């Protein structure tokens, strides 16, 4: 389902000229999105960022690799160690990777650049992909659907990566879906311990404005209240909202420990990101380079996941040092939350999703 080849001059000119699609970064309400960048390369290619013309893996390849996260983010550092460094070392520098971390703008800017071919590889979430390309696949990033990384990997193989799944829709837009890695668990911030659905009844909960997320939390019993992300701190401080949700990294980055006493590890949403490839770049690679890059990515997501999980534990400890009560996952009755939200999940699977919630849950 690869897309038709696009005019080759646009990609070549954009990459050689290093035209910036946009500059800036900002924490999005979902989990903190910013950009990657328009790297300047002079590959001499007329149809791809990769300067391959033979299948023997002997040609030089220049890859522009973007992420919305800044260089100090653990996911960026892990990608450098487990993917970029490995690729360059394995090929003795024949394949070089230009890392553009938080230099392109937000999620939409990065996806624009990937589609245009000014970026060859990008890390992005299933939520971002479903919002832009295929809302029927939002289940991969909706609350209380995915249990853990093993479950997500099974869902990825069954429903996302096949060409009759999400990947086919992405390929029609010039993007190929690759392997996924763990980014973090979205959990609950409040001024009381949250361990069961009873604890959230009537709480004014700030959520990103995703209809599917709102449906589930409404069903569970929270009073979902829209608040712009840049107003979250003050809204919690003044009581406009009682609670929020997000990863521990976000909780610390915006100092929510100053206005919330508890961080309850509800693990209601598994944050993941995928390796995404510009399809024209991918098709321009030799067979051996395709194998090298994709197999290295498959290995990298394992190491990246381990590094990020380890860092997450350190952040929980850091939050406790700031005076936060961290309610551990083992104290949370997650099954009760899933049961409470199940009617909404079933309605979503019937009216919006490409697959049934029971089929997704059966893969756990």
Language-model features: where?
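Short, glycine-/small- and polar/acidic-enriched structural segments
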Residues: 56-62, 71-186, 242, 265-269
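Structural motif corresponding to alpha-helix initiation and N-cap regions
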Residues: 107-108, 194, 229-230, 298, ...
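Conserved functional loop/turn residues at catalytic and ligand-binding sites
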Residues: 118, 204, 221, 239-240
């Amino acid at each position: 389902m690869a897309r038709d080849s696009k005019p080759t001059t646009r990609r070549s000119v954009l990459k050689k000229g290093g035209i910036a699609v946009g500059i800036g970064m900002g924490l999005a309400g979902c989990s903190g999105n910013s950009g990657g960048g328009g790297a300047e390369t002079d590959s001499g290619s007329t149809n791809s960022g990769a300067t391959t013309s033979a299948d023997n893996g002997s040609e030089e390849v220049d890859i522009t690799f973007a992420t919305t996260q800044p260089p100090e983010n653990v996911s960026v550092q892990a990608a450098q160690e487990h993917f970029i460094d490995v690729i360059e070392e394995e090929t003795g520098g024949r394949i070089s990777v230009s890392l553009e971390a938080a230099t392109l703008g937000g999620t939409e800017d990065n996806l624009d650049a990937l589609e245009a071919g000014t970026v060859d590889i990008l890390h992005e979430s299933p939520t971002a992909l479903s919002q832009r390309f295929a809302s029927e696949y939002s289940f991969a990033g909706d609350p209380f659907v995915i249990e853990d990384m093993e479950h997500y990997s099974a869902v990825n193989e069954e429903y996302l990566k096949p060409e009759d799944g999400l990947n086919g829709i992405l390929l029609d837009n010039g993007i190929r879906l690759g392997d996924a890695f763990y980014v973090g668990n979205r959990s609950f911030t409040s001024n009381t311990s949250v361990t069961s659905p009873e604890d959230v009844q009537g709480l004014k909960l700030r959520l990103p404005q995703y209809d599917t997320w709102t449906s589930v939390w409404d069903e569970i019993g929270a009073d979902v209240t829209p608040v712009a992300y840049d107003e979250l701190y003050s809204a919690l401080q003044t009581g406009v909202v009682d609670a929020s949700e997000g990863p521990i990294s976000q909780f610390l980055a915006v100092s929510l420990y100053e206005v919330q006493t508890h961080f309850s590890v509800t693990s209601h949403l598994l944050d993941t990101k995928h390796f995404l490839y510009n399809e024209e770049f991918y098709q321009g690679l030799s067979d051996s380079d395709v194998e090298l890059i994709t197999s290295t990515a498959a290995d990298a997501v394992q190491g990246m996941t381990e590094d990020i999980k380890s860092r997450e534990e350190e952040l929980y400890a850091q939050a406790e040092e700031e005076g936060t009560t961290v309610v551990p996952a083992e104290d949370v009755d997650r099954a009760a939350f899933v049961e409470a939200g199940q009617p909404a999940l079933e309605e979503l699977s019937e009216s919006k999703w490409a697959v049934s919630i029971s089929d997704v849950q059966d893969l756990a």
